Amino acid sequence: MKHPFQAIPHRQKKSALLILTLLTVLLLFVMNWIGVPLITSIAPAGIVSFEFAGNALRVEEILNSWDHWAQLFASLSLGLDYLFMLVYSSAIALACVMAGDALLGMRWLLPSLGVPLAWGQWTAALFDAVENYALIYILTNGVFSPWPEISRFCATIKFTLIALGMLYSLYGFIGHLANRQQRKMIDLSHP
């Protein structure tokens, strides 16, 4: 199955990746800043601790460690995350498509994983959206099962897919650099 990003011309892919990466970093910075009040001894990873709490008792402990303002910041962070998930998933998806293209051109291993992993990034964003819904439900309606369990399940899938996409993108980037270096060496040996 083709990915929509495969239709983007190569030169435009580079520009699009740069823009998406810069937006991802900017939003990550803003969300980390918003998340500072969420870091407590009970929730050392802030919102991520909340995502992975996994049961009602742990969620109650985390919510009790946050004052009213921290809970408002958590809500703001979860709302902003809906924009963030569109940006980060598209950035990593495009990087996966580009990595697959680069690996195919160099005849390295696993070029065909680029497209499925690109789709996987948008799947990660869907899991992120469900996770956020579960967390927003908890913040607005109270702590009830199965919402903490749903959040942890979705966060686990999300982070796994993101990690696979980032590792594959790095692999493709290393392959691209190696191929570029090899071409330079060939050009130098044939003046």
Question: Where are the regions a protein language model picked out?
Answer:
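Hydrophobic alpha-helical transmembrane segments
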Residues: 76-99, 166
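Juxtamembrane loop-transmembrane helix junctions in multi-pass integral membrane proteins
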Residues: 4-12, 65-68, 72-75, 105-115, ...
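Multi-pass alpha-helical transmembrane bundle typical of ion/small-solute transporters
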Residues: 27-33, 66, 76, 152-160, ...
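Alpha-helical transmembrane segments of multi-pass integral membrane proteins
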Residues: 119-174
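Interfacial segments of alpha-helical transmembrane regions
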Residues: 14-21, 107-123
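Structural signal for the C-terminal ends of transmembrane alpha-helices
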Residues: 96-104, 174-178
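Interfacial loop at the N-terminal end of multi-pass membrane proteins
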Residues: 2-77
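Short, highly charged, low-complexity non-transmembrane loops/tails of multi-pass membrane proteins
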Residues: 179-191
